A protein has these predicted regions:
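GST-like domain detector, emphasizing the conserved glutathione-binding G-site
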Residues: 9-64, 144-153
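Short, small-residue-biased leader/transition segments that mark boundaries at the very start
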Residues: 1-8
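C-terminal cap of thioredoxin/glutaredoxin-like
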Residues: 68-153
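A structure-centric signal for secondary-structure junctions around beta-strands
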Residues: 4, 49, 127-128
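Glycine-rich phosphate-binding loop at the start of an alpha helix
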Residues: 1, 46, 114
Length: 153
């Protein structure tokens, strides 16, 4: 079984790639009229935020949670490494931060994330966004049209 740390250790930080990705994200956002700001606090320690997706799913607010966390990081540029900032974001969507965080740290939630991570690893998924259509992997936002074409074949 592989943990998230194992996956991340394999992906070396390459400064030239990081610089390119920042520029590319800004270009794609501008072209598609998406409100986006590269977060100056990046990289964000996202483990607890990812666990939160499973808690939010149990509460029936997964999509809302994902949208608000995404906006906090990539639109508002908030420091989501700071627990106080995370608490404020959670409160703004009527989530009790204390209870939510406790649930996110439960063994059940940890196991769910670990299971999904292992499933992704076994399928050959290595980054986001990844689309799987008819057992074929399409990686990157620039491959969405290829994935759609494959789906309607």
């Amino acid at each position: 079984s592989r943990g998230l740390g194992d996956v991340y250790k394999r992906q070396a930080f390459i400064p030239s790639k990081a610089k390119f990705m920042i520029r590319d994200c800004k270009m794609v956002a501008e072209k598609n009229k998406i409100n986006f700001k590269f977060n100056s606090y990046f990289p964000i320690k996202s483990l607890n935020l990812m666990r939160g997706v499973f808690v939010a799913a149990e509460d029936g607010i997964k999509d809302l949670y994902i949208d608000k966390i995404f906006n906090a990081v990539w639109v508002d540029g908030l420091n989501m490494n700071d627990e106080i900032v995370v608490e404020k974001v959670l409160k703004n969507i009527d989530i009790n931060p204390k209870t939510f965080v406790l649930r996110a740290q439960s063994q059940n939630i940890k196991n769910q994330l670990r299971s999904k991570t292992n499933d992704a690893y076994k399928k050959g998924i290595f980054g986001a966004p990844t689309f799987i259509v008819k057992d074929k992997i399409f990686w990157g936002q620039d491959r969405l049209q290829y994935a759609i074409a494959e789906a309607i074949k």
